[in-house]
Every structure is written in structure tokens, then in C-alpha cells.
């Protein structure tokens, strides 16, 4: 069988443009001041200090700018006037049709496949059963793959059917090919690009590294039908990327900020996009890209096909799926129970509220002695506590900095850069502010305050143990948190962690607690002249 393969011959393939690296761009505004007028750093935008006025310079730029997309026009979609397009290509193979429901269920159980939604297609067990056209299959066979992975076996029929799809699977599960091969089929069924047309397939990814990896796969499997692509990300010159977009590409793989730059500058448009992919959606939200994603999606016709992929399924990712996808079908690989990364050692200590500071300091001492290159992310329940313990740590000689919603954006970027580079190996954060944190080499997470729910606990500790590394999560748990004990014990048990007998007792008998001692919102505005500018004590550490 074939899928609209008649367009391939007129395409000239070229690999995407632009080398270089992913970055936020534009400088960090790297100055700050205290009462002595201390200021330092660098920035393309300039900064200064006199008489204690901290130097904010440079701004953020690149993929971090919160006002990106302000210049994009609101689209009023009238689908009755828009050209129709094909998106349903799946025809079930006879071998698949002949399998009994029992056989299908057994296959899904064996491969830990769970599906949700109406009329989910049956999984395929071989590449031939997926029904890809020869121009795709020739390259698949050339790669020497033995059989589809679990996510591919179930995901290919779903994506080829033209339905909106959510896929939840660990990194390394083969999800990139799960959406790339149907994307190639989709492109070859559409009219050729005309001059001035934007891409047909748009893939949004959180980082340059992932975007380049996706581009490699698209290039490999799209070359037989001469599909052109480009990779658009910040921190590198725009020229080569603009050149590619101007020539015309069927596939654009992009990080959100740089794509909005291109759209605002009129270098491309999304009018032809009919196949949208959000890859690593959870990580894009972690990095604070939700506003940019929403602005981009608003520029795409609403009857598109959308495929959303994520390693986890927290409530903010679920909300994104509800907003962007229509009547979607979902595939999950592995358990859907709330579980923590098994590479993370979880230590939960029962303490009283007034013991927390000393206990935290002792842990930092041990961490420092074991490895001076450690990075520690400390979570608090409120902005006030974040500032309080940052001052406490700095006065005790620890180079700690805090990040929360009352800090100005350029200060938050500066703090994050100090933490990423290891100049300040301790960062104190609230849950909301942590959405912009994407640091791969965090060795320890310390929960100074326990979060409001177990999902946030798993999300917090997941900041360590990334990319195959091991990590440690330390949690200070008080009687005020007793109502969370049962859920916490379940998470610890699932990941085979040691459980403090007192915590187990709380789980058996505990009920509601009084919440955090501080309660409420933090008061006052943060700033370089506040907690982050508190002088380091004489007992310098780290």
C-alpha cells in the first residue's frame, strides 16, 4: 500500500541550518548591589552601581524572554475558507485484524502498554504491520531494527490514524520515531510548498540538544522522499536558520523562544502546519515555556493533528493536553501509579519545625565533605522562608542564592546562571519559581518544607537523578505534614527506600495537620539588595 507518495520527486533535501548552542541569549544582567554599592558582572546591556543601587543589566533575551510573542497577531480561524488536508492514513493490516481481543490484551500487558480513549487502534507487532510506504520502510530496514519498541507498536497506528495523541514514555523508549515516521507520511500526502509557505510539520522541543537529535532522525528517514528540514534554536546566529526558512522546509524543529523570534520578524509562518508535535512537554513546562507554547499554538489552525509526548503526566501537562488536543487517545508505557525515579535515594527525616535549620546545615556539611562539586536545590513552601534561610545560610558562610516569584526576571536569570555554573552551588527555590529551572547535574534536592501534595514531591525530587545519573533527595518532615504521610510511604515503598518507623506510624494513624508554620504569602519584594546580597559570613564554605 502507499500513502500519497507522489510529491517526493520535486523536493530538494538539505539538512537544517545553524550550528552553535542553545542558550537564553542576551547576557545575564550580572550586577547586583548591597548597601556598600557592590556591583559586578557582565552584560551586553550594561549595568552599574552607585551608593547601593544594584546594577540590573542586559535583560534575559533568547528563549527566556517572558514577553516573547507580544507582536503576534490574534488569528481568527474560519475553517470553511481554508483548504482541506489529509491526516488519516492508517489501514489495519490483516494480521492485526485477525488477532483476538485476548491476544491484543496479552501483548499490551507483556509490554506494559496502557491505552485510554475511544476506539484506540490495536498495536502492531512488526514494522510491516504498521503499513508504512516503501520509501519509509527501506530506511527502517537499513537501520537494522529488529522490531518496534512498545511505544512504536501502539503509537504508530494511533498517529497514522490522524487522531490527536498523547504518549507517556521514558526518554530512550523510541518515541522520536513514533511521531517522525507518521510525520513523513503526512507530509507526502499534502500539496507541495509554494513560495512563502511555512512548514507542514512543526516539532517543539525544550532544548537545542533534543532539537538536533530529532533533526538527525527526520533527516535520516525523510531523505528518500527529499523532505527538507531545519532546526531553529536560540543562542546562535539567526542567518542560516532564516535562509532555510526562506527557501522553504517541510519540517521545522524548534525551541519556543527562537521560533517566536522568527514569527515576529516575519521570517516564517505557521499557516501550513497541519501536524504539530510537542516533545518532552513536561520538560518544556519545567523550563517555563508554557506562555510561549500557548502563543505558538494560537498561530496554528485548530483542526491540525497534535501529538504530545512526555515522560511524566503531572497536572500541568494534563491541562495542556486538554487545552490543545481534541478527543485525544493516549498510550502509556509502564506503570501509571505515582512513582519516583528509582535512581534517587530518598531520605526522610522526622523533625520539629525549630530543628530544620540545624538539620539542613548538617546535611550541607556532609554533602560538601563528600564532594565539593555537588549542587543542592533546596525547596521551601513560601517566598518568605526562601529568603529567610538564604540569609541564614549566607551568614553561616554558605554561597546560597534564592529564586522566587518576587524576584525580578533578570535577577532570577542571574541566580540560575550562578547555580548552573557552580559559582553558587546552593539554590533555594519555591515550587512556582522552580518551573524555570533546567539543570542536569543537580546532585541533591533538600525539601526544607514538604509540598502540599505527593505529585509535587515526586516532581521536586525529580530535579536530581537526571539523564541516567544517581541523585539524593532529603526531606524534613514534621507532624504538621502528617496528612501526607500515607502517600509518601507509598512512594517510598514503591521505590524500595528505607522508611522511618515514625513516618510509618504517622501513615497509620496520622490525619490532617496545621500546614506550614509561616503560612500565607511572603511579604515584601525580593531583590539583589535583599537575601541574595546578604554578605557571606567569615566562615566561608565550599
UniProtKB/Swiss-Prot annotation:
Residue span(s) of domain Helicase C-terminal: 346-507
Molecular function terms, GO-annotated: ATP binding; ATP hydrolysis activity; RNA binding; RNA helicase activity
Matching InterPro entries: DEAD/DEAH_box_helicase_dom, Helicase_ATP-bd, Helicase_C-like, P-loop_NTPase, RNA-helicase_DEAD-box_CS, RNA_helicase_DEAD_Q_motif
Keyword hit for Nucleus: yes
CDD domains: SF2_C_DEAD
First-level EC class: hydrolase
Record localization: Cytoplasm; Nucleus
EC number: 3.6.4.13
Keyword flag Transferase: no
SUPFAM superfamilies (UniProt xref): P-loop containing nucleoside triphosphate hydrolases (SSF52540)
Annotated GO CC locations: cytoplasm; nucleus
GO biological process assignments: nuclear-transcribed mRNA catabolic process, nonsense-mediated decay; rRNA processing
Motif (Q motif): 125-153
Residues noted as binding ATP in the record, renumbered to the chain: 169-176
Subunit text: Associates with polysomes.
PANTHER family attached to this UniProt entry: ATP-DEPENDENT RNA HELICASE DBP3
Function: ATP-dependent RNA helicase involved nonsense-mediated mRNA decay and ribosome biogenesis through rRNA processing.
Entry text on domains: The Q motif is unique to and characteristic of the DEAD box family of RNA helicases and controls ATP binding and hydrolysis.
UniProt protein name: ATP-dependent RNA helicase DBP2
Gene: DBP2
